[in-house]
Regions:
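Transmembrane alpha-helices of multi-pass eukaryotic membrane proteins
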Residues: 21-33, 53-66, 86-99, 162-166, ...
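A loop-to-helix transmembrane entry motif
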Residues: 157-173
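Helix-loop boundary elements of multi-pass alpha-helical membrane proteins
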Residues: 6-30, 69-98, 180-197, 254-266
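Terminal transmembrane helical module of multi-pass membrane proteins
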Residues: 223-266
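Transmembrane alpha-helix/helix-exit interface in multi-pass inner-membrane proteins
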Residues: 100-144
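Hydrophobic cores of alpha-helical transmembrane segments in multi-pass inner/ER membrane proteins
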Residues: 61-74, 176, 237-250
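Aromatic-anchored segments of alpha-helical transmembrane domains
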Residues: 34-42, 100-105, 200-210
């Protein structure tokens, strides 16, 4: 007589979770304000009200504030009576959308075109000297979009190899985020595993990004101490702190999904 050992298989669908309408409205409102503010800066630069340095610096502050929008969702929705896992899912989705939008809006276009666009740009003065070209035509404002971060960090315009290599992860994040939404639609119990696995990448990349410049004595930082803090701290802490937070939450949600989907096989 033989006895079979019970096993557990994950055959059931995970709980259905979607981006709630209230959280979506908060995200869309904040994103619309950020987009409008950025376009306003572009117009003010184009017509000569703002110079390249000031318009670029302000755009960096605006995007840094907008990347914190999940905190606004948490603050406004934390007592709304929503289930904990659904609430965490909303916060995670907001952060993932912010991250993927920055990938699409700047990082991937920069990775593809920067080596063609920026030629013989070694100093901030070299970059500012392109102002007349940018103001020649609205079509030339692509240069402003790609060049804004150069006001804070010249590695974005002088073909720095480390910076270029790190931005390759933008493609990985884009693909993994889209796949997460695919798995979520299928109610796969492994959907949050992608977040758990991927949360270490932005942390490692950001540490390399920031400290490689520290060890080089800030050679690519053309501004004052506040510009350096904006480049290496304020625009970057989100990619260290937030992945830690959401990696932990995703691990909790993954365990909840696995418990919900588990079937005991005798």
């Amino acid at each position: 007589m033989t006895t079979s050992t019970p096993t557990v298989e994950f055959t059931q669908l995970a709980p259905e979770r979607s981006f709630s309408l209230p959280a979506k409205k908060i995200f869309m409102t904040a994103t619309s304000i950020w987009c409008a503010a950025t376009v306003t800066l572009m117009v003010l630069f184009y017509v000569g009200v703002l110079d390249f340095v000031m318009s670029s610096r302000l755009s960096m502050y605006f995007i840094s504030v907008w990347l914190n929008v999940w905190i606004l969702v948490w603050f406004m929705r934390r007592h709304a009576g929503q289930g904990q896992m659904n609430f965490w899912h909303d916060l995670l989705v907001v952060w993932m959308l912010c991250y993927i939008i920055t990938n699409i809006q700047w990082e991937i276009p920069w990775f593809v075109f920067s080596r063609l666009v920026f030629e013989n740009i070694h100093t901030l003065d070299d970059l500012v000297a392109q102002t007349d070209y940018m103001r020649e035509s609205p079509w030339h404002m692509y240069y402003w979009i790609l060049g804004t971060f150069g006001v804070l960090d010249l590695r974005t315009v002088n073909h720095d190899g480390t910076f270029f290599a790190l931005e390759m992860f933008s493609f990985t994040n884009l693909v993994s985020t889209l796949y997460f939404f695919h798995l979520n639609k299928k109610r796969s119990p492994y959907r949050y595993l992608l977040v758990v696995i991927g949360c270490g990448e932005p942390i490692a990349a950001t540490v390399i990004f920031s400290f490689s410049e520290v060890f080089d004595d800030f050679v690519n930082m053309p501004g004052d101490v506040w510009d350096t803090l904006l480049a290496l701290v304020w625009t970057q802490y989100q990619y260290i702190v937030f992945p830690m937070i959401f990696g932990g939450l995703a691990a909790r949600m993954l365990l909840d999904d696995l418990r919900h989907s588990a079937t005991r096989i005798e």
